[in-house]
UniProtKB/Swiss-Prot annotation:
<dbReference type="Pfam" id="PF04998">
    <property type="entry name" value="RNA_pol_Rpb1_5"/>
</dbReference>
<feature type="binding site">
    <location>
        <position position="875"/>
    </location>
    <ligand>
        <name>Zn(2+) 2</name>
    </ligand>
</feature>
<dbReference type="GO" id="GO:0008270">
    <property type="term" value="F:zinc ion binding"/>
</dbReference>
<protein>
    <recommendedName>
        <fullName>DNA-directed RNA polymerase subunit beta'</fullName>
        <ecNumber>2.7.7.6</ecNumber>
    </recommendedName>
</protein>
<keyword id="KW-0479">Metal-binding</keyword>
<dbReference type="InterPro" id="IPR044893">
    <property type="entry name" value="RNA_pol_Rpb1_clamp_domain"/>
</dbReference>
<feature type="binding site">
    <location>
        <position position="85"/>
    </location>
    <ligand>
        <name>Zn(2+) 1</name>
    </ligand>
</feature>
<keyword id="KW-0808">Transferase</keyword>
<comment type="subunit">
    <text>The RNAP catalytic core consists of 2 alpha, 1 beta, 1 beta' and 1 omega subunit. When a sigma factor is associated with the core the holoenzyme is formed, which can initiate transcription.</text>
</comment>
<feature type="binding site">
    <location>
        <position position="72"/>
    </location>
    <ligand>
        <name>Zn(2+) 1</name>
    </ligand>
</feature>
<keyword id="KW-0862">Zinc</keyword>
<dbReference type="InterPro" id="IPR045867">
    <property type="entry name" value="DNA-dir_RpoC_beta_prime"/>
</dbReference>
<dbReference type="Pfam" id="PF04983">
    <property type="entry name" value="RNA_pol_Rpb1_3"/>
</dbReference>
<comment type="function">
    <text>DNA-dependent RNA polymerase catalyzes the transcription of DNA into RNA using the four ribonucleoside triphosphates as substrates.</text>
</comment>
<feature type="compositionally biased region" description="Basic and acidic residues">
    <location>
        <begin position="1369"/>
        <end position="1381"/>
    </location>
</feature>
<comment type="similarity">
    <text>Belongs to the RNA polymerase beta' chain family.</text>
</comment>
<dbReference type="Pfam" id="PF04997">
    <property type="entry name" value="RNA_pol_Rpb1_1"/>
</dbReference>
Amino acid sequence: MEDVFSYFEKPKDPIRFNAIKISIASPDKILSWSYGEVKKPETINYRTFKPERDGLFCAKIFGPVKDYECLCGRYKRMKHRGVVCEKCGVEVIKSKVRRERMGHITLATPVAHIWFLKSLPSRIGNVLDLTLKELERILYFESWIVLDPRNTPLRKKDLLSDEEYNDLREQYGPDGFQAGIGAEAVRKLLEEVDLEGLDVELRDELKTASSDTKRKKVIKRLKVIEALRKSGNRPEWMILTVLPVIPPDLRPLVPLDGGRFATSDLNDLYRRVINRNNRLKRLQELNAPEIIIRNEKRMLQEAVDVLFDNGRRGRAITGTNKRPLKSLSDMLKGKQGRFRQNLLGKRVDYSGRSVITVGPDLRLHQCGLPKKMALELFKPFVYNRLQEKGYVTTVKSAKKMVERETAEVWDALDEVVREYPVMLNRAPTLHRLGLQAFEPVLIEGKAIQLHPLVCTAFNADFDGDQMAVHVPLSIEAQTEARVLMMSTNNILSPANGKPIIIPSQDVVLGIYYLTRSKEDVLGHGMSFSNPEEVRSAFDAGAVELRARIKVRIDDELKETTVGRVILYEIIPEAISFDVINKVMNKKELANLIDYCYRLCGEKTTVILADRLKDMGFKYATHSGMSFAVRNLNIPKNKKDIVVRADRDVLEIQKQYMDGLITDGERYNKVIDLWAQATEKIASEMMGGIETEEQITTEGKKVVESFNPIYMMADSGARGSNAQIRQLAGMRGLMAKPSGEIIETPITANFREGLTVLQYFISTHGARKGLADTALKTANSGYLTRRLVDVAQDCIITQQDCGTVDGISVSALMEGGEIIETAGERVLGRVVLEDIMDPFTGEVLVGANQEIDESLSEKIDRAGIESVRIRSVLTCKAKYGVCARCYGRDLGHGHLVNIGEAVGIIAAQSIGEPGTQLTMRTFHIGGTAKFEEHSTLDSRHDGIVKYVDLNYVVSKIGETVVMSRHGEIHVLDEQLRSRGKYTVPYGAHLKVKDGQSVKRGDRMAEWDPFSIPILAEVDGTVKFGDIIEGKTMQEQVDEVTGLSRKVIVEFKGADLRPRVSLKDATGKTAKVPGTNAAARHLLSVGVNIVVSEGDQVKAGDIIAKIPRETTKTKDITGGLPRVAELFEARKPKDFAVISEIDGVVSYGKDAKGKRKVIVTPEIGDEKEYLIPKGKHVSVQEGDRVIAGEALMSGVNNPHDLLMIKGEKALARYLVDEVQEVYRLQGVKINDKHMEVIVRQMLRRVKVIDPGDTPFMADEQVEKFRFQEENEKAIARGEQPAIGEPVLLGITKASLSTQSFISAASFQETTRVLTEASLAGKVDYLRGLKENVIMGRLIPAGTGLVMYRKLGIKTVADEDAESVEIEGDENSNKKSLDMHAAN
């Protein structure tokens, strides 16, 4: 009996190996895999359906078709296991071997492997130093190659055409020299390659290489040779002599009805190879003419090419239905390939899906599961329970009973389901909260019920959405589902640490209604001694819900309303009444939940959320709120505003006709006008809706209105002011699909209705919106996929890496306003060094301490501007990152656990809001956007302080700013900066240094439509190289007939249009304080305002650079911008930036480009070429610092890395990405971006390899680089020199150490070719490669340190207690993991 199990093979355990290697298969290796040669192209006999002998499905080679049964039927069943039948030669064994046994085809002539030939760069070509064209001519029998020149003047590897070959043969005789053709010749050459010798030779050549191209070529060859040398692969293995045949069950042939067969394309491809191979063998035996044999060899080469990679060379071979056949490569590639279809995503059993509907009476940890569905999902458990209870004895009878659906079955199901977590998932699962665990509640009906508060996390609504249910089977899976995935354990969003379970829509409306107050209603002004009294009075109908009353709470008389006291009943005791004694809108409710979570913990918060939901629904129903047309009040003076705007537009038109303004300015002004009119009507309308007159005992009184539409928008339940504006105000300006704004606005609103033309104009935008949305989803999904791929191996691997490096974080400013204080930005991070109070000098936060909410407030109160914190960017951990550098796990609010997959969380957090970003590139036309940016108002009370501000007083007494980087700071009483405002060049200052300002005071203003060029000194205008008709044109406006002097593009001559100022002596004046001349070079498009010989004073405008008007420069925004940043692409018009500190001067123009020279105080000057027509943003004599832009344009991240280093670059990337998300109102914590940027900066480019094994220009991982250098230094040799490189996320994913991960991402063929050539080893460190290999992932509970936890049982007291003990411990095992830190 004990031997019976040895009959069954144990399933192979995927955990047993810890690395996997890929290399090129040698012919011997292929033969060792094979169980026999496939000689015939036949597959199966069409009459008997039995496989043909020696054919592609031969049972003798590949194993029996039926379990333990030979083909002729002589041996059947287990007792003959392992016998080989004498008659048909089939081994009696399980038929499963047909999935793993391989065969082979012995090729009549060698054939090149297309991957090594055509995958660029050609590997065979690299080894032999032949180009791909030359190789193809040899392999496809067009040219001969000289193998051994002997005594002839030919050189080895010379190519000869047929004619040349024949002539030379005649000349030198048959033994004069040796030449070959086809794959045999190439194989011969590859066999002769001496890798060691070639390696030495190439390294010497590299030292003497003169030109850059030569070096690059040698380096490329050296890489391939090195890879072959180190991996132990032989070059001739790239040419095949034996072809493996994959197991038949992996290329099945299935009979359809009607005698036809459905087959895998591979069978056709193999058939072609076998047919051609057999024909070639026959021709060779018959000694056929060389030309025929050669043609057959070429056809065999092509057949093998198509089998390996169809379409790689020439046209793809198509099958019967004009569809290209799927080759072996296609089986791996793309979304439908093996990697992504079957290994990374599999179908799941024990799952079901159905439509969802709302379950308002569920608790947060519950979901409603239809009985029918539950019965199907839990069937095996129900069978077991019925057997346990003794209703049935066998599974068969249990099955029958369940089919009858008797009462016992439902009882059993109830017991099985009780407290058994199931997982609900809604596609698309954009972040980890798209899959959560709930306890099922059995319900009638066929729809799954979902708790309303988790809808935000799932992004679900009930307009027909479907969700899937999955049952975790093992006890470990159940524990993980309960501990880690239960909806009650996922209150905070992992993206930003704010609660994601917050009331929305109806609930918000109900609670808003409950906490609003109303004048003069029943019970107004009553006083109560405690909340209970209020409740009884309300129940008795003695006081109305919104009445203002006084109540004694915590020995204090509070003014409040009845509704708020009722709300107070459900608030946890720890939270004071003042927190909710206000109108509770959505924001306040989110804050309440956040506050409750921090103060009272998870459990209390869950209870509070549920109570809020119940109360919200109840009072939303009570309020009887409705949406009616009468609620939309159109403002009385709308007509007047529109008429006035029309009049103003005509006025502007007239100015244009008179030539006072240009067409662009006219367009901008009109757009501005209408934007203002729309704004005005909207504010009038909102004013009308927000307030209403109420007749009270004190007479008429204006009070906040109870207009339902206003309440919906004000509470944050649904709708926004912008939408109400379109319903009752005026629709306003519309954009064309190109992004330009149409001058004529829609003056009607939806209540009045649109005319046909107005409707047509608005369809433009609407259609573009729909097209955008469709594109956006695909693009956003692809971005997420790239992010996940680059960050998937970023896991918390240790507690502390012990680094002494970190980054500085200061408050985030935008337009002078502090958007996020330093304290808020470092919340949940670990401090690098002690933070001192700048005034008292006491230590606020000790080094290596995590900053929690209270410390964050402390930092802000102390007015600390910048904090040094630890960051993943500077983490020293070799694999993954350490917990201290990462900081707080935002989803749970404590320091992150070891094993957390922070890379994937980062990728999800950035990718998930991707669909909310806009797709388009913004065109900031002349909309109200500009108008905001032409003035500067103080946002705080305080004292003005000029910083780096140079100014002059112009002749009309205006203070004009002359500096380019000037700032105005507003300081408070302690002289701490409250606001920093950058003042542009040419602005007019309205405040003096040291003056005190109030909030809202105007501090500066400037012309929004052009950038001025100002005179620095008094003097006379002199033009240089401004030649009419060549460099300058008087452009006459067609409409107005007025002229302007405009610099135009000019070809040829070395002309530099400029304006200089001459002093009294006629010399060029000097700029005060410097040695530079008062001279301005003008770029194309500048309008000159002065004429030659004019007298000007300092501060006067000489010329204007118009800001692009109708279509301003496209600001790449939204999703494309995020992708551009993460892909580290060079922007289209990137700015040239200075590499050094120094003084600017202009050099002689070269090749139509401006030459800007930066001269440092010590060292060599640097020259920069700037294309003409681009505006140079520095003047002669300006001081610049390293990293400062010399012209207008976007930064190029690669330059930033080179000049300012990794931290500055990381800061730039993080801030730029954040900017895009902030515009859409999405909050994502900086640390997620930092994780991605860390992955982009993982590699170093070797500049000088020193005595290390690296090659010049090779890119290597930072840690490998450091390791090799340490080794070299230890040996007393020269270490390598390298510089950091920035890789885009796609490049970074493909250059990861794991070839399995890279191959499953993109460019599968290329990755596998490279990996096999180099004999790469994948140590399975990331998540993806482990999923593909079918192992537990090395993160979370799959970490080795958690897997090794044992279970200790207490000494046997009695069997039962031991059982329980073991059970508890196995639960504990997973729980411990949660609290491991």
